[in-house]
């Protein structure tokens, strides 16, 4: 019943994330259950909803639509997680604060959402060198039991996801659409098992892809990650926006440092100059020592086991990558 009630809120025109958070805050402050507020509609007014919105919310048609969607989630083993629950990713909640999504939908191993993780962002039309570097970075992380987080798009994202899975690691697919339309892509279908992945979406389950949502989900990728690796970024678009948001939210941003950046990576120098940490290499292998240092710093604060870097030794200042 509770899931259908939450979906009823999400489906109502005029109710967005901010209004849902106000309702949740009201329930906590007044010690009400969600069912209580649906049984006593005047409580919605006390929670700050307008009368016309309340009428839409409580319509029979919307109630039936929400119940049908809840049933479909159950049939597909999809979890609805609110920010009030312990299963909600705590790092996301801490990183984004009041801007974290009030509701997530997840399918797969949801414990990965609260695991040490590094996010990836990069071009859909990445260079072969960029793809290779992303795969090598993900391999090192997987070998050190660090979850790889990315946006499940072609190019950089898929290279990072696939490499993590190929190297017996785990990955989080952060969707720019609802979780119901999502499918397992051919490139990774033979690598998937019940424990090594989770799909997660902040959008209504039947939402189709759009560019605005692709930008919006950047916050979830960043919020789930203790550090971000920017592989290749042009001077506009989703990767550029993700890099800017990482810097703005204080998420450590690591940037592949190319000796002669091409168009696919023309904004990489900008991010290094703006506070990103350069990732260089030795014998073509990315040196992730500072990434592991960030993870270990967070592990010590959380009293968890630190990771031991498998990156090349011999200092952080290595050689820039050639495209």
Where are these regions (language model features)?
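Short, positively charged patches
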Residues: 1-132, 139, 321
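Glycine-biased, small-residue-rich flexible motifs in mid-sequence functional cores and linkers
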Residues: 2-3, 83-323
């Amino acid at each position: 019943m509770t899931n259908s009630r939450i979906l009823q809120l999400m489906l109502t025109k005029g109710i967005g994330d901010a209004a849902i958070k106000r309702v949740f805050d009201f329930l906590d402050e007044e010690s009400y259950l969600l069912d209580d507020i649906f049984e006593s509609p005047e409580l919605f007014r006390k929670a700050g909803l307008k009368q016309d919105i309340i009428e839409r919310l409580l319509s029979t048609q919307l109630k039936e639509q929400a119940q049908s969607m809840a049933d479909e989630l159950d049939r597909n083993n999809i979890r609805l997680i609110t920010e009030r629950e312990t299963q909600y990713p705590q790092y996301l909640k801490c990183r984004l604060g009041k801007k974290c999504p009030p509701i997530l939908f997840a399918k797969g191993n949801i414990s990965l959402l609260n695991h040490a993780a590094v996010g990836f962002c990069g071009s859909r039309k990445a260079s072969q060198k960029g793809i290779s570097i992303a795969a090598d970075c993900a391999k090192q992380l997987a070998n050190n039991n660090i979850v790889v987080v990315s946006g499940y798009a072609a190019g950089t994202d898929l290279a990072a996801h696939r490499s993590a899975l190929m190297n017996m690691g785990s990955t989080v697919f952060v969707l720019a659409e609802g979780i119901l339309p999502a499918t397992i892509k051919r490139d990774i279908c033979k690598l998937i098992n019940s424990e090594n992945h989770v799909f997660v979406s902040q959008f209504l389950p039947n939402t189709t892809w759009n560019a605005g949502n692709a930008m919006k989900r950047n916050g979830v990728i960043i919020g789930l990650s203790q550090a971000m690796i920017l592989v290749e970024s042009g001077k506009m678009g989703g990767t550029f926006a993700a890099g800017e948001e990482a810097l703005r939210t204080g998420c450590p941003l690591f940037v592949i440092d190319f000796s002669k950046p091409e168009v696919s990576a023309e904004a990489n120098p900008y991010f290094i100059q703006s506070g990103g940490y350069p990732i260089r290499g030795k014998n073509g292998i990315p040196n992730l020592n500072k990434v592991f240092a960030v993870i270990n710093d967070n592990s010590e604060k959380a009293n968890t086991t630190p990771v031991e870097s498998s990156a090349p030794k011999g200092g952080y200042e290595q050689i820039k990558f050639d495209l």
